[in-house]
């Protein structure tokens, strides 16, 4: 007699039960949940004397910026006119506001009121800029005019805040000279490379360090180099808050690396350069303790939303500076296409309950994503239109000029506006990017702090945001609440609002502790139940068949 299981109907039932068991036992990836932010005040880093975590050496030549035809350095920068800085000086010039610039250092210049704040690269004083980035950023914030405009009278007449604390002592001797290769790729905005567990294999070239000033666009004409103005000739470099004081803290550099550098990943040729998120955290605490009332961070780390690394120390440092020490923290949003940075979706029409589209974030920008404590800045062009390469994200608060940038050279001290080609056949690269947009907003924050010293840092940010020129939707992920308006921020009747952020409500993607082993009890119960049911069905079918066979 043929086996009952040889009947087609019973074979199908058995196969169906087997497939059900296999499907239930397969490991289907779970959906990624984005946890809400949390700040643990106990994790605020100690304010030790600035210095590197490990021995460092210079590995590249210093960058030497140049002057190109456009923008014309003999005229005021287009961004200066776009946001009407000269009129804002009628109400405030940032008198007495200490502005910390956490960047590549600032080279001293008679037109820049700068004090040393320390150096996390070589343990020096922070008054050295090998990357020609921090000096340009500081020029936008506080450079004194030369020739085209007169130096405005200090407003308010009395300095709003005490001068910053004295410089930190030097903790290490300068590094001995080392043989260096030919000129490095040009810098701004410096991107921090953080060593984290690698995410799933990225597309080719993802995560590689692109030129921080943005790759040249092959569709645009090359801007030819031109001779700079002679020393002492009038130029268009003018800071937003010329009576503010810059505190220079060198935290990042592409010209230095550890003496014993390590790769980012086991299969990566990318090396960890000078500057990490932890050193940003320490620099923020140090700047706040020196008395900075505005902290400009024009360095950006971009990380995948699925693997943002452990940033609890940075979050605690930002919380401390913003709430305990009352500092306005301004950060660059990042530039699309650079070192892992990419645009996030703008809006999900299927989810109107999430107008900033946090749930579709794919790449996060740090420290910008700590939006309870940081004012993140996107970039517009010389006409006020959003810059395509300005990284979008729900943390963007406002926008400011990010093209046609000029500043003071860290070498000769004169006006510069571009980097030379890093390789034969490449183009000159005019300064552009959200690094410089952040500098404009830091200058505006200094103006507001000087005029309204009674406002808290959070209230200053509120005034800047409330007075911005909104985009068509009121707010979006490219421009935030729109282009800053310094005159409106200084003159409009704007309610002060809450003294502090309502809590850690920003949707910062922070890594949780390592997850516990998967709990498969529910799955195992389901498998057992289905197996029992399937076994029962088969047994009943076989029993019925046997009874009929008798």
Regions found by a protein language model. Name each.
Residues 51, 62-72, 284-307, 332-333:
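Short acidic, glycine-rich surface-loop motifs adjacent to enzyme active sites
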